[in-house]
Amino acid sequence: MKSLFKPITINKIELPNRIAMAPMTRMMSPEGIPGENVKEYYQRRAAGEVGLIITEGVEVSHPSSSGYPNVPGFQDKADEGWKNIIDAVQSEGSKIFPQLWHVGAMRKEGMAPDPKVPGYTPSGLVNTNKEAAHAMTAEDVEMLIECFVKDIIKIKDLGFDGVELHGAHGYLIDNFFWEGTNQRDDNYGGEIDKRTRFACEIIRRARKKIGRDFPIAIRFSQWKQQDYEAKIAHTPEELEKFLMPLVEAGVDVFHASNRRYWEPEFEGSNLNLAGWTKKISGLPTITVGSVGLKSDFIGLYAGEDAVESAPIDELINRLDAEEFDMVAVGRALLSDPEWVKKVREERYDEIIPFESKFAQSVYY
């Protein structure tokens, strides 16, 4: 248990423990402005001793980035709301990274803020051989890279402790990573290392503007919401080709998204995706996926009303073995903002179990 509550330094910031709040979409910021309820939501988790808050996805400042209503953004009128959130979280002793998000292929025509703007993807694909979006031109690619960079500069200026790029689950950066949605024949497509270039350019250009001391994380996944069986890398060797360009570009930490953290990534080893990522990259990694629960999030969509809490002994054993460095907790923190504190004090019988109503309260 001690390893879970041992401080860790990411770049130049020290986190009080190894627990992050996983980013979870909320859709509770009308006109993209996070209000008092959003501040209270994050402050409660920070007061409950979460070491690092990773916010819900925040839209990149371009109309093609939006895929859902009432998602926060970084327009000027949102500045005050973000500053209030940052102050509230930091006053509780926690750190906070916003997750910078472009939905890519998940955007449907007719959505706000401009119904005429389609979804943007590398090759106009939402899935392998399924056309459903605008195929980005070279000019589109350049423009969106600059949109990401401008937002990262603003994120630092607002006072956040770092930033996470959402490169997982079938959204735009992941659309570039995955060969199923990236069939480009220019420098942004092709072999696995070339498919990282979009993300690498964002990171490299941001580094030139913000310096080396501001933490940049990237979340990635093998699975996609379009295809749960999809993989970016089928072997450790392919994973290395994927990771190392991102390391060289200036990433500080990898957030490796699994649906179930205990599942091994490749045959012949018990290491999960975060474990392999740490072994290959040498950088700190965050694991995630049904922490503290007995089943993954898919049950929510299948009508599952409740999920039984699960022991975290295996998680602690893996952390003790230094398989990964941090743990992101999602649904368990929705149901119980004091989950971290109760775990630290070994008050397991007082943890509030997750029920679907907690997800509904977050979404609606």
Task: Describe each region flagged by the PLM.
Residues 1-364:
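Flavin-dependent oxidoreductase catalytic cores
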